[in-house]
Structure formats: structure tokens, C-alpha cells
Amino acid sequence: MRQSGRKSNQLRPISLELSPLINAEGSCLIKIGNTHVMCSATCETTVPPFLRGQNQGWITAEYGMLPGSTSQRIKREAALGKQGGRTQEIQRLIGRAMRCVIDVRKLGERQIIIDCDVINADGGTRTAAITGSYVALHLAIRSLMKKRVLKVNPLISQIAAISCGIYKGEAILDLDYLEDSDADVDSNFVFAGNGNLIEVQGTAEKNPFSEEQFLAMLKLAKGGAAELFKLQNQVLLGS
């Protein structure tokens, strides 16, 4: 039995608040249990040097955690003078994931920057960031099309992400911090809207895990992603 009382295939309570930031083209505050992440999408009329003159755009991402987002204060990376390896890994993951669901050729020479700021961390911050970032990106594209900055919708697919793990010998969905810190296996799954995989991250913390255990986690993750896609559609269609 999970300490939270949740079933093995049960997500934490989820909410998606649209457009909490008034200046970004698109923004979303995602809450999954006690993990809260502010996601925004901002358009700039510049592209990285390697894309100049090619009439296509780019999507990149930045990720950070507020000092008070965890039980012990995190030092600001700006004050330290450099980003940590975990931060770089996560923001590259978010950028890669977003580029899989948008046709950058339809952006023209524009760059969309996804910003993910963790307000409260209780496990699954990177997966929450991806799920919330899609909503922010969708709203940004909608805004750019309404302003006629973009003539064609470049979005190809939805995207959502969720964590799974092996905890006390059982495959479970959407780990909170206590589960994650004591899990035998910790994994993250990123899905496109059609159920195809965009990225899988999986690590054995203690002992190697079997193919059977991996498939059990994959099954749970697909079910969780389906719920996330449904919620994304509900809030976006209602806005």
C-alpha cells in the first residue's frame, strides 16, 4: 500500500490553470499533488546562429527551481554562477520533447522559449513541466495565429509526460518525493498524443529491473498519459 493511499495506477490530483502570466504569449500553472510548476512560452524574432537565413524556427527550454520549492532552501544558480548538471539535463529534455511535436519550419525565423519554474517540488517536476509546457505552447501558438504572426498552425501533436517506478516490488504511477527517494526503479515516460513514445528515462537505484517490470511501468504510464491528454483537451477546448 502506498503511503498516500493511492492505487498503483492512480495519479495525484491535477489542475491546469491557463494564462496566469499576462505578458507571455502562453502560460500554464500545473499542479500535480504538491508539485507545482509555472510554465510559459515566449516568442522571439531571433533564432540560434546555426539557423539564420534558413527561414525556420526553433524551440528551446529553460528550467529552474525556486529557492523555497524544497524542504531545504536551494541556492539560486545565478548566485552560484553556473547551472547544475541536473538543470541542464532537464531543460534539454523539455526542449527536445517540444521540438518533437511542432513543425519548426512553419515558425519562420522565430524562436519560442519555454520557461519552467518549479514553485513547489514533491516528485515528478520534469514530467509536470513537460505536460504544462504543452499547454503553454498551445496557447502561445493560438495567440500568434490570432495576431496573424503565424499563418499555419505548426503543432503536430499533443505531448504529456509521467513518472513510474518500482516501489516495494510493485510498479506504481506518478511517484511523489517519498516514493521516489525510496524506489527500486525510477523512470520517466514522454508520450505523443497518439501514444507513441518520445523519450524514456529509467534507472535502477538498487537492483537491475526485468523486462516484465519495465512493461508493467510502460502500461501504467500509457494509462496516466491518456488521462493527462484528456485533461489538456478539456481545459484548452474550454478556453
UniProtKB/Swiss-Prot annotation:
Catalyzed reactions: tRNA(n+1) + phosphate = tRNA(n) + a ribonucleoside 5'-diphosphate
Matching InterPro entries: ExoRNase_PH_dom1, ExoRNase_PH_dom2, ExoRNase_PH_dom2_sf, PNPase/RNase_PH_dom_sf, Ribosomal_Su5_D2-typ_SF, RNase_PH, RNase_PH_bac-type, RNase_PH_CS
Residues that bind phosphate, according to the entry?
86, 124-126
Pfam family membership, one: RNase_PH_C
Record's keyword terms, sorted: Nucleotidyltransferase, RNA-binding, rRNA processing, Transferase, tRNA processing, tRNA-binding
Q: What is its EC number?
A: 2.7.7.56
GO biological process assignments: rRNA catabolic process; rRNA processing; tRNA processing
Q: Which GO terms describe its molecular function?
A: 3'-5'-RNA exonuclease activity; tRNA binding; tRNA nucleotidyltransferase activity
Question: What does the function comment of this entry state?
Answer: Phosphorolytic 3'-5' exoribonuclease that plays an important role in tRNA 3'-end maturation. Removes nucleotide residues following the 3'-CCA terminus of tRNAs; can also add nucleotides to the ends of RNA molecules by using nucleoside diphosphates as substrates, but this may not be physiologically important. Probably plays a role in initiation of 16S rRNA degradation (leading to ribosome degradation) during starvation.
Subunit details: Homohexameric ring arranged as a trimer of dimers.
Q: According to its UniProt record, which protein family does this protein belong to? A: Belongs to the RNase PH family.
| Entries under NCBIfam families matching the protein | RNasePH (TIGR01966)
**Listed HAMAP family:** RNase_PH (MF_00564)
What this protein is called in its record is Ribonuclease PH
Q: Which organism is it from?
A: Rickettsia africae (strain ESF-5)
Write the gene name.
rph
